[in-house]
Structure formats: C-alpha cells, structure tokens
Amino acid sequence: MKKIIRIIALIMAMTFVLCSCSNLTFTSSTDSETTSPAVNTEGDGLFGNNKTEENAVNSSDTEHPKVKFTMENGGSFVIELYPEYAPQTVENFVDLVSDGFYNGLTFHRVVEDFMAQGGDPEGTGMGGSSKRIKGEFAINGFEQNVLSHTRGVVSMARSSSYNSASSQFFIMYSDNHTYLDGQYAAFGIVISGMEVVDSFLETERTMGNDGALSKPVEPIVIEKAEVL
C-alpha cells in the first residue's frame, strides 16, 4: 500500500513545475548532450553513486567554485559549480551564499525519485530573493547546457517566465527526468554528501502546494551555506 501511495504521489508531483509558483506545468524535451568521463558523487545514498555519462563535465581551465551546505542535523554536502555552462546562475548563487541568504532556510519540497527543492525564504515555494536572473537554457536562446538533469545535478527553479529564477534551486534524485534539459538552468553537481540529500526522503511528508505528498512535516533546515 505504501508503495502504491508513493507512486501516486510521484505522478502527481511530476505534473507540476519545479518553480516558485505551483500552477504551472512542464513542457517535455528529450534533447540532451553527453560527454565523458562520468562524474562521481561520493556516497551511495538511496539510489547509488552519481555515476552517469549524462552529467559528465568537460575538463577545462575554468575555476569551479564549491559550496558547502551544512544541515541543522549536522550532515553536510558539497556542490561544485560550473560557470562555463551557466555563468549568471553561478554568480547569483555564489553571491547569495556569500551573503548568508540560505542560512536558516529549508528544503520545502522533497519528492522521491525526482528532486529536493529549497532556497525559498517563505518556505512555501512561492518566494525568492529580490534579484531575478536570466534563464540560461536552450528554450530561452542559450546554448544547450551539457549538464543533464540526472542524479546529483543542481538546477534553478523558476515560474513560467523564463527569466524568473532567483534563489530557489533543486537537486535531482534520479536519472529519469532528462526532459528538463533545455528548460531549466543546471549549474552544479553534488560531489560529496549525496547521502545527506537522500536522507531528506526519510522525513515524513504531507500535502504540499504542488498537490503531492512533498512537504516535510519536520522542517529540513539549512544551518549554514558557505563558499569553500
């Protein structure tokens, strides 16, 4: 019975956009570029290591900032950022982290086999920071991003407006949603501590603004985010 409920909840959740509004839907896309070698996220978690050619990154001389999120429960994870693929997105994210914006905020939406979403000061999925940035993805006129929406990849949430992203971001749990490629700005990968992100799924959840069982009953709180 629990398995059936999870499946129903996942189907419901996937009918809503990863955004700061809850009444919008995805448009599907199957286009994605891949490179090799694969990127490995340390820590098995619930879905295994983050080893997939879909989210491989070309090595280059570009500096890759790293951001560490320490959770209130003591666990932590590190995100490596890729400004060569989404420069404005990375700059905005680093600025928010440096300003302490994410400290004390939560992951307000957690969906099994899909993603964990956070960074909303309202904790509802309807808020954000004061600054809006351009959506650096293909359907908004940018070059196709090689970071595919696979396990461990970090991407920006937005509303139906392509240029509405601000502070909300999401972390992918699985490789099953690459249709998001070209529609959302993927800009980083969890390189360590993915098991901590997986642990969010162990939290009891109730009905969220997306109409699915995605809202944690006990808040999943970010104690501190810092640039390493």
Q: What are the residue ranges of the model-derived segments?
A:
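Sec-dependent bacterial lipoprotein signal peptides
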Residues: 1-19
